[in-house]
Curated annotation (Swiss-Prot):
GO terms for molecular function: lyase activity. InterPro entries: D-Glu_cyclase (IPR009906), Putative_hydro-lyase (IPR038021), UPF0317 (IPR016938). Belongs to the D-glutamate cyclase family. This is Putative hydro-lyase Nther_1142.
Amino acid sequence: MTWKQNETEIRQRIKEGQYDGPTTGLMNGFTQANLVILPQNLAYDFLLFCQRNPKPCPLLEVIDTGKYEPKETAPGKDLRTDLPRYYIYRDGVKSAEVTDINKYWTQDLVSFLLGCSFTFESFFLQRGVPVRHIEEGVNVPMYRTNIKCKDAGVFHGNMVVSMRPIPENKLTEAIQITSRFPAVHGAPIHIGSPEKIGIKDLDSPDFGNRVNVESGEIPVFWACGVTPQAVIMNYRPEFVITHAPGHMFITDKKDMDYFQL
């Protein structure tokens, strides 16, 4: 057994900064989450933004002001250390990329955990639906689109999507699987024709890495929890912390906890 198959060792390596890579494919079966941390004076507007845009921003948990333990999704864990990599934004611009946010922590911060599409990938693998970024050992490709989100207070902007190439004969199955997970982005937001949602070049993702789209495959797009980062860049708040795209928080929840019949 390698360390990547050992739950305890994975968590320990991430906490200690020994692993700072993408979390796709790690601890299959455990739900992963996007993280947004912002000052209390912005928390209500962001909560409203998530409620109005549940496809890209499905709320899993909101942590009390100044607290960093996600008691609902991962009791005993610490959001300041338990992600592989974080982005620090100042005035809407990424100013640092770190593996520990203890020195940035203040008592007025509110943390939000949002559902992540990595959750349904283990079901793809079980059913023989390929997950190209796992096959190629890279981060999932993510793209800005022309799909507008609903405004909420100071927050406004367009949706970010993740893309997975799906063989034509597996497309229906992929849609059926993901539609059972509304808490983690659910069914695709768009299928094929990337130009129709404002994506000019699949080989040039805005976040993550490019993957190969093979003959007989269709690019399929899911709403993505990196959307808040794009929205934050629009508003340019003084200070925000997020996960680095693809470097998620691994909760104690199981993927099946979010499966709906």
